[in-house]
Design a protein with these regions (language model features):
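FIC/Doc superfamily catalytic core
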Residues: 1-354
């Protein structure tokens, strides 16, 4: 039994989930996925801002309007993807991918760039339409990597969707292999002028969900691991976009290994999140949080059960002086674990397990 089979056996052992556990996991995934997928691409909303925006529709603190709109649209796209994944008798289409992209970008917009000599140029990013100009990326090693040309993109996307539908029917690949191969091939095409990374991560989860596998989050704090896995695979596959867009399972082995390990890690987190219980067990952005001081958990539990509790009352209940309470509050706030609402109530961003 390989590692994917082992982790799926552990996952299946805790099924069916209670309604409460399904809701808890769905809420955590919604925040984690949207925050991380957009943060990888430069969105500046904090984890706490993302949670409050998506759960309550409110903005806390300073935030760029573009980032707020982007995060809101991302959540709409996530919901759309999950609904489409349940239509298992309907094959994947290019139309769905383009519609998903239009949902993420919302509308066409112009990008302005300064040229040497003080001149300015601009071009239009099209929502839901394949690229009309070449795109490339400067890798972390300083070299330019070209994606498929606008002329070859429609045919390559047609090949990708056709391959996926046939591969799914054949049963030749596991859902994890399908998701990894689709992600890599899609990235090598880079069919749109913007939003390709976000679409790739949504589509990988579309494939997993379509086969009743847990969905995953590429954590922004591990962005370098993600990009390095893609880069190393590019070196193996070769620079030609048309070759990358048809890469075999053997050729993308390095990215498949990364993706498989990510899947195991994320499902392990889900299992722990749902099964570990206790007043000292806390969760934040895909990690189990342990505190050195027992008073920190006591403070968080009091804030959770009594959001309007005052600092003097926290001091009295925990048995430490007010200066120590304020010091811990500052540390928790800095890490993004807690916020204080405008009415003075405490809002926990970190998640309790009780």
């Amino acid at each position: 039994m390989d590692k994917i089979q082992k982790i799926m056996a552990r996952w299946n052992a805790i099924l069916p989930l209670s309604e409460r556990d399904r809701e808890l996991l769905s809420r955590r995934f919604t925040i984690d996925f949207n925050y991380n997928s957009n943060h990888i691409e430069g969105n500046t909303l904090t984890y706490g801002q993302t949670e409050i925006l998506l759960l309550f529709g409110k903005i806390v603190g300073e935030a760029e309007a573009k980032d707020v709109q982007e995060m809101t649209a991302s959540n709409v796209g996530l919901k759309m993807m999950k609904e489409e994944a349940q239509l298992k008798d309907i094959p994947l289409t290019q139309h769905f991918i383009r519609t998903l992209h239009k949902t993420l970008l919302r509308e066409d917009y112009k990008v302005f760039r300064n040229l040497p000599g003080g001149q300015t140029t601009s071009y239009t990013i099209h929502a839901g339409i394949y690229k009309t100009r070449p795109n490339s990326v400067i890798t972390r090693y300083g070299d330019r990597f070209e994606y498929a040309s606008p002329e070859e993109t429609p045919a390559l996307m047609g090949d990708l969707v056709e391959w996926y539908n046939e591969a799914e029917k054949s049963g030749k690949f596991t859902p994890v292999e399908l998701a990894a191969m689709f992600h890599y091939r899609y990235i090598r095409i880079h069919p749109f002028e913007d939003g390709n990374g976000r679409i790739a991560r949504l589509m990988a989860n579309y494939i997993l969900s379509r086969h009743d596998y847990p969905m995953i989050v590429v954590r922004s704090r591990k962005k370098n691991e993600y990009l390095e896995a893609l880069h190393k695979t590019d070196l193996t596959v070769g620079a030609a976009p048309s070759i990358g867009a048809h890469a075999s399972k053997r050729e993308i082995q390095q990215f498949l290994t990364y993706f498989s390990n990510l899947f195991v890690e994320e499902v392990s987190y889900n299992i722990s999140f749902l099964t570990e219980r206790g007043e000292n067990v806390w969760w934040f952005d895909g990690e189990r949080v342990k505190f050195r001081s027992a008073t920190t958990s006591q403070m968080l539990n009091l804030m959770y059960s009594k959001p309007d509790i005052t600092i003097p009352c926290l001091s009295e209940n925990i048995g430490i002086n007010i200066a120590s309470v304020n010091k811990q509050i500052k540390q928790l706030t800095t890490k993004g674990y807690i916020q204080r609402a405008s009415n003075g109530n405490w809002r926990l961003i970190i998640t309790p397990s009780i």
